[in-house]
């Protein structure tokens, strides 16, 4: 075997070893995005919900800033309940359909049905809640503190 071939083989092996250490991506976020688009009939891009208020996006704390942010807190809480049932919401794939009336969850196992129900409820909530541009990309350290933490900061 030529030395160049050995180098290529070594590079492939190292790449595969590195890839095996990467944690799984949140696969069902693609499905959640599709449910959101179905529920709001494509009127607002899903990205607009990824950094909104105190709960829409990664993490969450404090008091939701409005109805839309409450949808996200409820969704986070629902995923927490799914975890208590032994489900892994961010990687649970499920069946759903986008029908003229609204999106609907399809058949599946207990975790698939539960996670789909969480996502469906949130998507429908997003569709009916007003979107306030002032709550996009807010300073969560200032506006999303818990009451106890905020009181400690003022003492």
From Swiss-Prot:
Expressed by the venom gland. It is found in: Secreted. Its main location: secreted. Keywords: Calcium, Disulfide bond, Hydrolase, Lipid degradation, Lipid metabolism, Metal-binding, Neurotoxin, Presynaptic neurotoxin, Secreted, Signal, Toxin. Residues 1-21 form the signal peptide. Ca(2+) binds at residues 55, 57, 59, 76. Pfam families: Phospholip_A2_1. Its cofactor is Ca(2+). Belongs to the phospholipase A2 family. Group I subfamily. D49 sub-subfamily. This is Basic phospholipase A2 PC9.
């Amino acid at each position: 075997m030529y030395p160049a071939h050995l180098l290529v083989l070594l590079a492939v092996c190292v790449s595969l070893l590195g890839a095996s250490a990467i944690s799984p991506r949140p696969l069902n976020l693609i499905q959640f995005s599709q449910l959101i688009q179905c529920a709001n009939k494509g009127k607002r891009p899903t990205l607009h919900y990824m950094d909104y208020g105190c709960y829409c996006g990664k993490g969450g704390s404090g008091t939701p800033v409005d109805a839309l942010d409450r949808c996200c807190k409820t969704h986070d809480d629902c995923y927490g309940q799914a975890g208590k049932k032994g489900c892994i919401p961010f990687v649970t794939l499920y069946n759903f359909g986008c029908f003229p009336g609204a999106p609907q969850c399809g058949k599946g196992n207990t975790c698939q049905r539960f996670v789909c129900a969480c996502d469906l409820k949130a998507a429908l909530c997003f569709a009916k809640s007003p979107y306030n541009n002032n709550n996009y990309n807010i300073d969560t350290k200032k506006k999303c503190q818990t009451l106890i933490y905020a009181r400690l900061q003022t003492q």
